[in-house]
């Protein structure tokens, strides 16, 4: 990815939720920027023995958004599987759109809940967790996968950046 795609880390003064969502959005956008300009074959290219690929990472993050924000925070039913294998019948654009839609809904849930101390609607391993924990976890999870994506992208075409 060209140097022009690098973005500055959010620098804002706001309340806790605004700041956390800004950092999470930054990581979400970083994942999608890493995928820009690649062919379908490149997005599905497996660069490590575990089978991880760029499109699979984005698909996994769709499930993560659903699992944490839609299911645990908001109480929705969940039937995902965290599978990183995207069927060939599913296009890269469909996966990207699903990710944007999932995080858009997640942000709506966060705004509606509005309190970092509010507990999840559904327990995680028999414990209801505060929204603050879920946000912190998702920032870390998304950033970790953004790092994986950076390495895969560099292997594909030498591009680096965030």
Task: Identify the meaning behind each predicted range.
Residues 86-121, 130-139, 143:
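Acidic/histidine-rich alpha-helical segments that form the ligand environment
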Residues 2-9, 17-36, 40-85, 122-162:
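Short, contiguous alpha-helical
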